[in-house]
Regions:
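Short beta-strand segments
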Residues: 14-16
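N-terminal pre-catalytic "stem/leader" segment of glycosyltransferase-like enzymes
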Residues: 1-2
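Acidic/Gly/His-enriched mid-domain segments of enzyme catalytic cores or analogous surface patches
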Residues: 5-12, 28-123
Length: 123
């Protein structure tokens, strides 16, 4: 995955379901502009976004209830979203999936530990 040249010097909001959710909405309500918005998992179902980072396999949502309250939202997103949805494995049921280039990221950043989906998005 090459760096996204059009984003050099731009502002990106990475929005998950924790504190970033509140910070993002507060910023937007005060007129802050973001050049791109990256949604983490099911946040993509409730905000405008340019990209989704979902480092779970799509089968977690299609084939189980392991994601709890996120399951139905993610099924809907995965079936219809054109992408990119960065993930750890492709699934023919989800047309917008793009493999996250973990080997390239680890090599280029010389970083061998990413502990959550936000860390993957930042990398």
């Amino acid at each position: 995955m090459k760096p996204i040249k059009k984003l050099e010097g731009k502002t990106v909001a990475i929005v998950g379901m924790g504190r970033s959710w509140f910070d993002y909405n507060l910023a937007k309500s005060h007129g802050v502009h973001f050049d791109e918005v990256w949604a983490i998992n099911a946040v993509a179902d409730v905000i405008f976004h340019d990209r989704i980072f979902m480092l779970d396999p799509a089968s977690r949502f299609f084939d189980s209830e392991d994601a709890g309250g996120q399951t139905e939202s993610m099924k809907k997103i995965l079936k219809t979203h054109e992408g990119p949805i960065y993930t750890c494995e492709l699934d023919e049921r989800a047309p917008g999936l793009v493999l996250f280039p973990i080997d390239e990221v680890v090599r280029d950043l010389n970083c061998y530990y990413l502990n959550n989906t936000v860390a993957y998005a930042i990398a």
